[in-house]
Amino acid sequence: RSGRGECRRQCLRRHEGQPWETQECMRRCRRRG
């Protein structure tokens, strides 16, 4: 459970093809921890 690089990797894979959604996902992940 890293949370730093894993969050960005999961967001990029979960929102592949949606840069705007990936940025929001990373922002939410950073706020959660």
Curated annotation (Swiss-Prot):
UniProt keyword annotations, A-Z: Antibiotic, Antimicrobial, Fungicide, Plant defense, Secreted
Cellular component, GO annotation: extracellular region
SMART domains membership: Antimicrobial21 (SM01357)
TM segment ranges: none
Top-level taxon of origin: Eukaryota
UniProt-listed GO biological process terms: defense response to bacterium; defense response to fungus; killing of cells of another organism
Localization: Secreted
InterPro entries on file: Plant_Antimicrobial
Tissue: Predominantly in the embryo portion of the kernel.
Organism (species): Zea mays (Maize)
Ubl conjugation keyword on record: no
Function: Inhibitor of both bacterial and fungal growth in vitro.
Protein name: Antimicrobial peptide MBP-1
